[in-house]
Amino acid sequence: MSVLRSGSPHRPARSLATVAGILLALVSLLLGLPGTAGAAAMKPAPEPTHPGQDWAGSQIARHEGTAAGGAPPAPSLASVEGVDVSSHNGSVAWSTLWNSGVRFAYVKATESTSYTNPYFAQQYNGSYNAGMIRGAYHFATPNTSSGAAQAKYFVDHGGGWSKDGKTLPGALDMEYNPYGATCYGLSAAGLVNWMKDWFATYKARTGRDAVLYTSTSWWKQCTGNSAAFGAVNPLWIPRYGSSVGELPAGWGFHTVWQYTSTGPTVGDHNRFNGSMDRLRALANG
């Protein structure tokens, strides 16, 4: 009869393998538990608490001030006057704006996946009824949900597009975070990927490449001056001074210039960089 001796060479090998397996299982379990560093990094921020106070440029003057050099030059024949509005403007006097020469408008539709502008119908339909070409924009909060989720919410709540000659492609407002960390707690690569997700989803839903609203200063700080969008997405740039100034990487020209936040009737005034025919072409796609 054979005797199992304590010095058998096989038992330690089996014990080591068992211990290694247990350790591997424990490590895998720990990595998958909530509250770990990886999970915490993916936890969404709370939904916006004052979305009615967030509009295109609401953070620009606060962070960048007004550029030296005074008022912008007089409009040229190759430009079209426009405005942008949100709920903070309330019911807008569109006939007054039309009579002053305003011919296009952007209207805030949504923020994150929880807010819709309560004045959207009056502003979006009112500008259209006055004769203007108009479009909608989304105020991005990249730390609350994915780019795809926010693009879908935008399209479902007023941000769609139709080839009627009066509807501009939707716009994505990327600017300083009104709720905390300037770059929303994301890395440059993380923000770029979030925007790619948003733009791809918007195009899949509407067939159009959306406009990007951003300032050169924020863009440099938060995306590392990425050149990923300049060849496709028209640039809407805020700068309150006598010229557009330096553009973000990737763009050789701007499409819309938000040149003041203190203009008549609604505050934010813009100039389209081209003739009325070119503005219609942008609307028609």
Residue ranges and their predicted role:
Residues 26, 130, 146-152, 272-275, ...:
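Ligand-binding grooves and catalytic loops that recognize ribose/phosphate and carbohydrate rings
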Residues 75-205:
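Substrate-binding cleft of extracellular glycoside hydrolase catalytic domains
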